Amino acid sequence: MNWRSEWLWIEPITGSRRTSNFCRACILFFGSLGFFLVGISSYLGKNLIPVLSSQQILFVPQGIVMCFYGIAGLFISSYLWCTILWNVGSGYDKFDEEEGIVCLFRWGFPGRNRRTFLRFLMKDIQAIKMEVQEGLYPRRVLYMEIKGQRDIPLARTGENLTLREMEQKAAELARFLRISIEVF
């Protein structure tokens, strides 16, 4: 949900705290935990998970492989949970016509470059570009073309906007900034 007035447009950006990421992280965590516990159960010769019988699984080679897959899955799951906890990719786009400044802010991974803050003058913005690739894996991205700089993406690839929503968003932004739209 964006906030807009006559002189100011603020658009919050959803980062990694999405329902799909929560579901992926949960499924991956419980699946890999199950693999790990079955592998350990085959080593100990006891059922650590009452529902699953691990007596038919030999520790060499199946138990070792299941432990390995379980550990790998737990590492990937912890990475996903950290990105959700730190809300990587979230931030806002702020277009301030009164001051003539565009500010783009994003949160990243902890460290020296945790905060990404870009500022541009509105008069340096040349156009809003739309990249549209249809097919099996469609790609629709909005870019802001800035004089003397590379194009800056505004809409992420994972946002899954329909073509109509993308055109509407590009048209509203171009109208607010009083610039043209380019499609490639």
From Swiss-Prot:
Q: Where is the signal peptide?
A: none
> What's any GO biological process attached to this entry?
photosynthesis
Which residue ranges does UniProt annotate as crossing the membrane? 25-45, 57-77
**Membrane-topology descriptor:** Multi-pass membrane protein
Give the location in the cell.
Plastid, Chloroplast thylakoid membrane
Domain of life of the source: Eukaryota
Is Plastid there in the keyword field?
yes
Task: Output the InterPro entries linked to this UniProt entry.
Answer: PSI_Ycf4_assembly
Keyword list, A-Z: Chloroplast, Membrane, Photosynthesis, Plastid, Thylakoid, Transmembrane, Transmembrane helix
Give any Pfam family that matches.
Ycf4
Cell membrane among keywords: no
| Gene Ontology CC entries for this record | chloroplast thylakoid membrane; photosystem I
Supply the NCBIfam families for this chain: PRK02542.1 (NF002712)
| Family from the record | Belongs to the Ycf4 family.
Q: Which HAMAP family match?
A: Ycf4
Q: What does this protein do?
A: Seems to be required for the assembly of the photosystem I complex.
The protein's name is Photosystem I assembly protein Ycf4
Origin species, per record, is Cycas taitungensis (Prince sago)
Q: What is the lineage of its organism?
A: Eukaryota, Viridiplantae, Streptophyta, Embryophyta, Tracheophyta
Gene behind the chain: ycf4
